[in-house]
Amino acid sequence: MRTFLKTPRRRATTLAAVLVALAVAAAAFAASTASGSRSDTVTLRVGLFGDFGYHDLYAKYEKSHPNIDIKEDIESYPDHHSNLAKHLAVGAGADDIESVEVGFIAQFKSQPNLFVNLKKLGANSLQKQWLGWKWQQSIAPNGAQIGLGTDVGSLAICYRKDLFKKAGLPTNRDAVSKLWPTWQAYMNVGKRFQKHAPKGVKFFDAGSNVFNAIIAQLNPAYYDSHGKVIVGSNPKVKAAWDVTMKGVQGKQTAGLAAFSNDWNTGYKKGTFATVTCPAWMMGYIQGQAPKTKGKWDIAAVPGGGGNWGGSFLTVPKQGSHTKEAYDLAKFLTSPASEAYIFKQTGNLPSQPKLLKSAAVLGFKNPFFSNAPVGKIFGASAMKLKPQVLGPHQGDIQTAVSNAIQRVEQHKQSPDKSWKQFLKDVKAVS
């Protein structure tokens, strides 16, 4: 998971458009074959839900593979996964490589017949490259491997030192980490912050982000080990809701929808002091508010550990160049590529050798006050334990984000919104 954009993907998203595109492509292919003028250039389209930091790598790959032309399609997180599902259903319209976020990987790996089994293209020889649980997350029920892992989202808290200072709180990252061993302690710090905060500044950005971080530390959370939805019966999910609501009702939240334009503006204007911060969030903050360099630092996450996000590169079977697509995906997820992306964007590698390497452990991010981000996030990633994920993980996450927003916008009470959330979960799952 990484910088999310709202740019619509410039490709067909309806069945009619897909069928028209197929007809045009077939006619063009027939004409080029008949004339003998068909180009040897292979165009590979890569479908992403944000900036993965691949642009320099594309150029490098094209230089060493002169017959390959790479095009990138970017759209918002929910639209990307929704449209991918549609394209798979109709058998056309998918890109040669499609990214899938961990919240949706269970949904797509339940349809392995729609993806290339990467084991048949040699991926088995790469298995030890990844954390064991990361490799396993994209294994389909029939044993097929449908994706190559990109990053993992081990957690921390990114905070504005200048705003902490104005509120009379410590600014040193070690001292700040000690303020909140638990999420309840985090809310208590928020209460202190609000008493002395600069006008218009809130302690955290969005209740949904706090809730998601707490959920990321649970196992099980939304699903049990048998794949049953347990949202309503898991007391830890309700406890996560309750502690989040304390911050929301305590007016500690800016009440922003994550990845919205208002949220992006909040980074620029400094309207919130903390954000739950998976490793990939570093690149997002840098991209949204470059002029805040040096004002941010990174502390430990309350509760310790947890993983929020991380993605995979898949190869839909409907593509015309599946072998070439796999080769590109293999390059983009190679150790050298993932190490490069980490230093450029903060997306944490999902490969143990890299997580233990001096290149990662010794890396400090100047934007975040030279925080030892490799050490902070890398050490956490090595201790991560996979969470049980189900086919509607992403849908449930969307439903709870909407539920929290209803409370933040004073449309429903916490109790009524929770009950509505449970109804919504039942409807989608």
Report residues per predicted region:
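Short, low-complexity disordered leader/linker segments with a strong preference
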Residues: 1-44, 423-429
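Short, well-ordered beta-strand elements
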Residues: 40-51, 68-73, 96-97, 146, ...
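Extracytoplasmic "Venus flytrap"/periplasmic binding protein-like
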Residues: 59-130, 147, 165-168, 265-266, ...
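Hinge/lid segment of periplasmic solute-binding proteins
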Residues: 102-156, 184, 295-297, 363-364, ...
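Extracytoplasmic/periplasmic solute-binding protein
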Residues: 144-151, 155, 165, 182-230, ...
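Glycine-centered hinge/linker elements that transmit conformational signals in sensory
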Residues: 187-191, 227-257, 286
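Extracytoplasmic/periplasmic substrate-recognition and gating elements
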Residues: 246-250, 287-348, 353, 409
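C-terminal capping/gating helix-and-loop segments adjacent to ligand/active sites or protein-protein/ligand interfaces
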Residues: 368-424
